[in-house]
Amino acid sequence: MRTKHSIPQARPMRRRRLALALLAAIAAPAAMAQSLPYGGNVVSGGATIGYSGNTATVNQSTQGAIINWNNFNVGAGYGVTFNQPNASAVILNRVVGSGYGISPTTIDGALTANGHVFIVNTAGITFGNSA
């Protein structure tokens, strides 16, 4: 004798809600990742990295510094400020990616500094109209 099993109507609804929650959890960091640089690791010299609202601030304390980044993008309406010791200070920003490879850098927002800032990305760098 075979019996038929029916799935209660609540299960598909729960699955939809779970799928939407997972999608939102994945999309939020991805959107942030496109707006400001992330995954910064100071590998030479002295510098600290902080975030407040739509701005990332790099406070450089030595004449030269190197930061390896997972991703370095500046979205429209966002900004990155480099506070350096003086006008001849130099900072090298290398985009090294993460376990998923390297994405091209896109600068659509503000990038300001009082010294010299270099960005190196082997996948390429694009400056948009709003940069």
Walk through the language-model features, giving the residues of each.
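Solvent-exposed adhesion/ligand-recognition segments of exported proteins
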Residues: 2-131
